[in-house]
Amino acid sequence: MPSLKDLKNRIASVKATQKITKAMKMVAAAKLRRAQEAAEAARPYSQRMGAVLANIAKAVTDADGAPTLMTGTGQDQVHLLVVCTAERGLCGGFNSQIARFAREHVRKLVAEGKTVKIFTVGKKGYDILRREFASLIIERKELRDVKRVGFENADQIGKRIIEMYAAGEFDVCTLFYSEFKSVISQIPTAQRLIPASAEAVQAEDAEHAGAVYEYEPDPASILEDLIPRNISVQIFRALLENVAGEMGAKMSAMDNATRNAGEMINKLTLSYNRQRQAQITKELIEIISGAEAL
């Protein structure tokens, strides 16, 4: 049984930890609001960018004139997975959730006989995936020193991916990130970047249903410029979604840690009081017994 001094030290230690987790929760809550606003503001832009690409792609009648970033290499053998996670931990299962989702995708592709390459964005994703797929990780990018994620960070990653594609290092590129839904809900998401998806987007409003568009100089040239920009935009959105998800998960994790610390303090305090009471009772019995002996 621990002594009163040990219990007192443990209570003081847990209280100190509780102060830290409470402060981290408040910091995460403050950052979450800004991160959530940024992520929600980026969604319409990235979605509309995809819609514009889809509309222009429909106007490209000559498949030979379309950019290779849209048409692809004609093969489906080498896959590059860009896995975006956080730089730091203490955010519950946020990082492991994305890594698990990517890991399942890797295993599926390998089972199909595909060649898989991994590009990690964020230290935690690299740390988790290298345990099983160290030989598959060909590129890593850390944003630890970045105080606030900006478009330039996403653009650097996008340009590097395009360089690798131009060098013939892969055929298909898929982006993995966590879409922010709420403080307690972040959904692992996979989005194909290359070849650029020309899937139909939501139907246009009735007032634009019969619109006829003219492209200058021509649709293929516009796509040549727009697709690389779209890749960076989609990566930027993924990074913003990740930041919001990380802050939400961290706030939830620190809230749980603070409450658990409170419960532990109550239990330790109860044990301390009971042991102290027993000790006082024992001392009183000894005093009374001594007095009676006299």
Swiss-Prot record:
Regarding the membrane, this protein is recorded as: Peripheral membrane protein
Compartments (UniProt record): Cell inner membrane
Q: Domain of life of the organism in this record?
A: Bacteria
Q: Please provide the record's keywords in A-Z order.
A: ATP synthesis, Cell inner membrane, Cell membrane, CF(1), Hydrogen ion transport, Ion transport, Membrane, Transport
GO MF entries = ATP binding; proton-transporting ATP synthase activity, rotational mechanism
Q: Which InterPro entries match?
A: ATP_synth_F1_ATPase_gsu, ATP_synth_F1_gsu, ATP_synth_F1_gsu_CS
One GO cellular component, as annotated: proton-transporting ATP synthase complex
GO terms classed as biological process = proton motive force-driven plasma membrane ATP synthesis
Subunit info here reads: F-type ATPases have 2 components, CF(1) - the catalytic core - and CF(0) - the membrane proton channel. CF(1) has five subunits: alpha(3), beta(3), gamma(1), delta(1), epsilon(1). CF(0) has three main subunits: a, b and c.
Note the NCBIfam families from the entry: ATPsyn_F1gamma, PRK05621.1-4
**Record's family?**
Belongs to the ATPase gamma chain family.
Q: What does this protein do?
A: Produces ATP from ADP in the presence of a proton gradient across the membrane. The gamma chain is believed to be important in regulating ATPase activity and the flow of protons through the CF(0) complex.
Supply the name of the protein. Answer: ATP synthase gamma chain
Q: Which organism does this record belong to?
A: Rhizobium johnstonii (strain DSM 114642 / LMG 32736 / 3841) (Rhizobium leguminosarum bv. viciae)
**Higher taxonomy:** Bacteria, Pseudomonadati, Pseudomonadota, Alphaproteobacteria, Hyphomicrobiales
- Its gene is atpG
